[in-house]
């Protein structure tokens, strides 16, 4: 029902709005995003409060973006599908407390990779096909955490089909 309400034709309402949330791994945090006025990187408590406040306004759709600390980054984006990933834990907690939400993920390596690219890099080149299994693991982990929609924002060829197969 939440997805149907979000994408219904010819009627613009609060059901069509998607609230972006930028998540950090801290329990409590509200850091301003300088390039986006009135936008913040939120800790766990602030994220849950923001979701609750938005629901009270009728906003049920959220796209969640992780802001990953450098210590969790590596060239294979291993933390992206790790069971201790704060992004996945916050998602599960949102769905537990607010099951009526529609949560949209960001499937991409760049928040988790040390080089900041959406794909594996070898000798200065993006390695498309070897990236696909990583994106698939990420998609499976995000679906298991409770995301309703998976949003692949990377630029890898064949990623959607590969993710669908994995799911």
Model-derived features with residue positions:
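Alpha/beta enzyme core
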Residues: 9-18, 24-167
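N-terminal amphipathic/basic leader segments beginning at the initiator methionine
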Residues: 1-8
């Amino acid at each position: 029902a939440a997805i149907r309400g979000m994408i219904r034709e010819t009627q613009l309402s609060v059901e069509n709005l998607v609230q972006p949330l930028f998540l950090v791994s801290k329990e409590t945090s509200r850091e301003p995003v300088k390039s986006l006025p009135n936008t913040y990187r939120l800790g766990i408590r602030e994220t849950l409060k923001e979701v609750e406040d938005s629901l009270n306004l009728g906003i049920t759709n959220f796209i969640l973006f992780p802001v990953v600390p450098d210590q969790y980054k590596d060239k294979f984006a291993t933390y992206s599908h790790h069971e201790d990933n704060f992004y996945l834990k916050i998602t599960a907690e949102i769905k537990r407390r607010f099951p009526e939400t529609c949560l949209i993920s960001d499937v991409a390596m760049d928040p988790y990779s040390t080089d900041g690219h959406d794909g594996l890099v070898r000798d200065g080149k993006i390695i498309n096909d070897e990236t696909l299994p990583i994106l698939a693991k990420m998609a499976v982990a995000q679906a298991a955490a409770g995301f309703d929609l998976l949003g692949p924002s990377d630029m890898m060829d064949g990623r959607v089909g590969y993710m669908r197969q994995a799911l």
